[in-house]
């Protein structure tokens, strides 16, 4: 039903005067309307709400409220249908009447139809029969139903309301009784539009409609002036961690680091492959094969023969019993160093076992460092003379070449041509086989002899001892980067960077939807004072702003805490040679290596300490006695030598006790020179001869050929450490020894090259540091350090086979001997030859009984030259290291196969002179052969196991900065870190250009600043900023992966010889011991007397020219060159892309107060002053001019009457007509007084004096106008209105501060708070405590709003503010908790803008403590003084205080509220 039906009466629409609301409109087109997002045609009528109806009128929306009749309905339960506004009586549930359309049941109730055509008033009729229900009508407009009808606006008359047409209304008739509801009528045809009704009077404003859609953007206004910088926003949360960036460009190689710790000993490597069989030698001339004769009877002892050529090595015999300790032999020349094995891990030190029998001699250890000067030993008895060595050919000394890099193993060279047969020598008489004589001193060095025929390959020797690690190699190509490490702990916040320049203004964005009201901004520049605004509601915080342009790089931050070490990256390339590392622990002895071939003679070592005098050995044939030469001075400490091959680990035996001294034997008679006899069996020991006179020093003789291996002698005492030998080729990896004790920490390795970024790891929360884990698996072996301190000297090894002597070359890798050459042709018969020439050499048999000496054969043709050995790694000369302790001798290894001849090495330094030897005949000088080709490179050994990670080394020198890598993709979002400590203030940025004018906003009322909002949501991660400046040197990082082993260092210098020991007493001859293993080769004795010149050897064929050697190792890094000249300034690079705005830096520190501004313009003219006091009388004036002529005198009798009437006496004449001057009393004093008063008032307006009558604006103005005033109380009127609201303040005339006291100024000291809760918390004094109050300031007699206004103006006039609060405590902590060492129990202060000031956190909101006496509970009263200073004057004064450590029965406090001072 329509609402006018519900009201019960039809009213003429002409009487309705509705109040229409013109809603916000938007011209959709010329006729249509847009309302709340819906489009309507012109003249459409709709109901946005049940009690509101709207119509579209040519683009304008007119809406009105539907008012219902207040009269009660005549039904028991009226109801409001859905979508309707007014209540109706419910329909009785009767069958649906027949309607014109046909028989159909009544449908659901339709919407109200539009109003029908109003008819004229008829006469009141009788109550009619109930009519049929009418069709539903649309809601009518009801404004004042209580008047008996509804107001329908005449404006609706002309609109299509989807139903009848409204006509002009008639006058209302009396209301008839309501009829029962009729049946629904059929819809009428649309009526034609009625004529427009009269315009109704405007209604009262309706309630504001909902906000319309935003209007189109206005034109851009002129640029406004830039506002002051707002307060810094809170920093956004860290952006998500970006994806790992692409790998950076490979940086340049870093400066070599220090060598790492000595690695653990690696496993023994597999045996190397057997070398190729050498080419067969040239066939020699056929000799007459002789059968081996049966051993004849032992002949008489012949004169000692010449030293025979070395025989083939015999098979290793069974170990003989340990013989008695022999006398110390001369130290042999250092053997070639074995290949460097991986250092073994040191084994646990075993307990000292029982003294074992001395083991057979091990293979010779490498030369140790010179030991310290020992005490002189007793002079030992001279040994019996040895057999004369066969003279060697004297070689010419070649210049020492620069050590080449290791050459590849060359192919076996072809056999050289056969030499011509030598002339047969004269046969000497056969002598008895002489006893083995003691070794004679070496004779003068002979010329180089011919090479012997190749021997049968000997058995493969055991692996040599591990060599010392070579020097580090050059830095390799940087390895691939390791995987990305886990995020480190958050470091402390660095200092704030300088603020960046203001970026250019961005393009104007479209207007966004209205955001929430932002927090009130900081005060702008001083404007003209406005009237007090209405207090607004605090706004909610605005959303985060767009990212701005990145600022310039910040100042250098402090070093962050070191992050946890990342995972080891892949192994990098070998680094450049590092500095020498400290000595590592001795490794456990490795397995005995196979016997190596003899190397070239090493550099002579200095003489070591004399050993203890051993028991005298059996005497040899009498030699020419020589005196022992003086020992040289001790040499400087050499570097650690390369470790020799170690034998299998044996238990350390205790050194044997020295045997009893034997008596000195008589010297034997030297025999004549005979042919070399076959080695006879060992005869009984002869008596020792008397020591011979010391012979003159001869030139050093050539080194004799190697004799057959004698039975092992007893182990000698440890000799002095020899010099460092040349490093040999690298051996295969040895088997792992037992784990040794932890070595000393090595030097720091070089900084590794940064690896590529690893794949993106998931961001995990940073956990607390865990306990130290178990040691991890062994890492890869670190780069070997420089040679450490010499290890204990090994026992003397068996003497290796002697190669053909040549100039000392780099030791080659031992090659296999070539096959024996074919028999040579038969030589010319020698004189007096008893036996035939010897047959081809058979395999070595066991030692048979000594046969009779055979005749000397004809000298065979020169054998083919053997293949050259591989070039060894050149060792660098190391720095001298401290001497090592002598080690226990190891057991001897089995004999190794002889090596191929190595190329000649550089000449060694002169050794200390040996005992004089018997002079040998001098040979003619032979031509030196050319250097043989280098041998082929051996197969690489298998890698050893990873060693245990070394301790962190000292930090290496910083490498040069790498090239900048390409930009990485953003990492994943990190966990939000704790707030950083406040950084130092940044510099003020330059003022940016004014931005474009924004859309004009509606003027809002100034709200009080709200409390700090919650932090905004995280901004999008910014793009990478430009790189910052170089940071301070960080703490040591975790050690990088060890580099590959470097090349060996150069050999160290030769140390000086040791001093001569005292001569020992001659011991008695001991019984013959069982033959002992051969002792280590002694050091060269002093130079013997010059031997006779040997026969001229045949000229050897020229050797094949060797391959070109590899380039030498890179030298150590040179010292930095002088700085180059300053380069020209480069052209400026192109501008980079605009980066995002960095996070807001913290506000800078409060700047110093500015200079006083200029004096303002004169104020407006003041009011008229009060009337001044009357001035003093002036001086008499000058006489006036003569007056006009007087009136005619009396005449004719009538004058008396005239005179009586108008004469002066009667007062009838005006004084103007008299002769006396006028008395004009001009009060000059009054005028001057008024001027002075006006002038004073103007002066007091321009320069107020701070009195109640002339208050100043603030104390700073007062100080500028009246600098002579002293500090004290004055009146100020900051709002410059009526002076009646001036306030009394304290002016500090030294600073210009305006200080306002609190009222009251103290909080009494007592127990204010009882806390029943278990947890303590901050409790605000004014908000929560019983009897508490918030602090007020100023004169309490003035109204509170007056003080608020004056304070507000005072804040606007001030650039900074400060205030002190004194907290008196009794058993209450105010700031620092002495027991816990933190400030968690410190007070909070609340500022006037409801901001909180704390002890720690954002520096803008932290107070300082001037005195802290409340650090513990003492039961006594004490105090803590807080101070807060800020450049944001709106934050002060402090209005409340919140203690934390209160609530206990014995906890009391009070407060002194200091004045708040504005400047």
Curated annotation (Swiss-Prot):
Which residue positions does the secretion signal occupy?
1-23
Annotated residues that bind Ca(2+) are located at 1277, 1279-1280, 1282, 1285
Q: Which residues are glycosylated?
A: 262
Write down which residues bear the modification named 5-hydroxylysine. Answer: 262, 283, 859, 976, 1093, 1105
Against Pfam families, the record matches this protein to: COLFI, Collagen, VWC
Region annotation (Triple-helical region) maps to: 170-1195
One Gene Ontology term of the biological-process aspect is: endochondral bone morphogenesis
What does the UniProt function comment say about this protein? Collagen type III occurs in most soft connective tissues along with type I collagen. Involved in regulation of cortical development. Is the major ligand of ADGRG1 in the developing brain and binding to ADGRG1 inhibits neuronal migration and activates the RhoA pathway by coupling ADGRG1 to GNA13 and possibly GNA12.
Q: What is this protein called?
A: Collagen alpha-1(III) chain
